[in-house]
């Protein structure tokens, strides 16, 4: 009988964490009887009664949590006599709060995503970076977007908020006024409506509002990667940056902030992407301008090669299985 693996997901919406869990689930089934427990996630869902029956049985069970509320629930079951291995992944690059550190110390094993996160945590951990479904996130030069008249697309995907660097992005894309067949498409959930209005005001100031599009968060993000020639990730902070890896898998030429999240591990500057200092408008503007004018090459093919070789969801799952079985 296979051991049991349960990934928990207690969140009101689908997020990058959700996608990272969904990416690896198919690769566990040869080794584990695999379930997800919670809501707003795709997978083989388990009921609370079935969960309890497993946790309080003699079946070898691994529970992998991703948020504090999930760890707390599992620790309650353990206090009541549940027998299982508790794995916790830290998804944020910031220094953990006292509560978070306390909860992580209660886990049997802790996973981090990138080197800086591992070094700053202060708790023994294993680094397992996220992976991409490389068979699904593929280039498609035939893909088109309705309602966008420009032929060439620059994409920014993810949450729309100050930490994600869209102010820097809008300032840098003022050069679009000189390139009427290029558009900036920003796809993601807006945290605060006034911030969106601030971005629109910048576009209006530079007279590029007809070349800047704001699209609500969508699960159909692959289509946007496939039409984009360039993807810009201008974040000041990232836990990982799955968007960047997904874009690279779709053969987008990526311009991303240096030493933020996994950017500097994914990207070798000038080889499979481009890096700039977070907040440096001029540096981003220069890289973008040179890319548009073909003064530096678009390196999407090299980007995909890097993801296939080192950052696939299958490879992530293999590394997680090593942790589960250790």
Report the location of each language-model feature.
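Aromatic "clamp/platform" in nucleotide-sugar-dependent glycosyltransferases that forms part
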Residues: 217, 236
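Glycosyltransferase donor-sugar binding loop
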Residues: 38-41, 157, 183-197
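Short His-centered aromatic/hydrophobic patch
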Residues: 65-70, 90-91
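A charged, aromatic-enriched C-terminal amphipathic alpha-helix characteristic of glycosyltransferases
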Residues: 297-325
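A conserved mid-protein helix/loop that constitutes part of the nucleotide-sugar donor-binding site
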Residues: 16-23, 152, 161-180, 184, ...
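Conserved acidic donor-binding segment of nucleotide-sugar-dependent glycosyltransferases
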Residues: 268-270, 274-281, 289-295
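Short hydrophobic beta-strand element within catalytic cores of glycosyltransferases
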Residues: 253-257
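Acidic anion/phosphate-binding donor-loop and adjacent secondary structure
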Residues: 98-99, 119, 132-147
